[in-house]
């Protein structure tokens, strides 16, 4: 149960940080030339 909780927290933090930094560095509205992530 403890391992599952650690896995869930790690996954959530990973995706949140990935989305957060991705949104800051590659904002579609500020960088219309970037078509890597729609």
Curated annotation (Swiss-Prot):
Keyword NADP: no
GO annotation, cellular component aspect: chloroplast thylakoid membrane; photosystem II reaction center
Gene Ontology biological process terms, A to Z: photosynthesis
Keyword Plastid applies: yes
Bilayer-spanning residue ranges: 4-24
InterPro entries, sorted: PSII_PsbI (IPR003686), PSII_PsbI_sf (IPR037271)
One Pfam match: PsbI
Subcellular location: Plastid, Chloroplast thylakoid membrane
Chief location of this protein within or outside the cell: plastid
Family annotation (SUPFAM superfamilies): Photosystem II reaction center protein I, PsbI
Alphabetical UniProt keywords: Chloroplast, Membrane, Photosynthesis, Photosystem II, Plastid, Reaction center, Thylakoid, Transmembrane, Transmembrane helix
Membrane topology, record value: Single-pass membrane protein
Subunit field text: PSII is composed of 1 copy each of membrane proteins PsbA, PsbB, PsbC, PsbD, PsbE, PsbF, PsbH, PsbI, PsbJ, PsbK, PsbL, PsbM, PsbT, PsbX, PsbY, PsbZ, Psb30/Ycf12, at least 3 peripheral proteins of the oxygen-evolving complex and a large number of cofactors. It forms dimeric complexes.
Record function comment: One of the components of the core complex of photosystem II (PSII), required for its stability and/or assembly. PSII is a light-driven water:plastoquinone oxidoreductase that uses light energy to abstract electrons from H(2)O, generating O(2) and a proton gradient subsequently used for ATP formation. It consists of a core antenna complex that captures photons, and an electron transfer chain that converts photonic excitation into a charge separation.
Similarity section: Belongs to the PsbI family.
Cited NCBIfam families: PRK02655.1
HAMAP family: PSII_PsbI
Protein's name according to its UniProt entry: Photosystem II reaction center protein I
Source species of the chain: Gracilaria tenuistipitata var. liui (Red alga)
């Amino acid at each position: 149960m403890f391992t599952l909780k650690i896995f869930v927290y790690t996954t959530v933090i990973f995706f949140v940080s990935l989305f957060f930094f991705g949104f800051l560095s590659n904002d579609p509205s500020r960088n219309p030339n970037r078509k890597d992530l729609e």
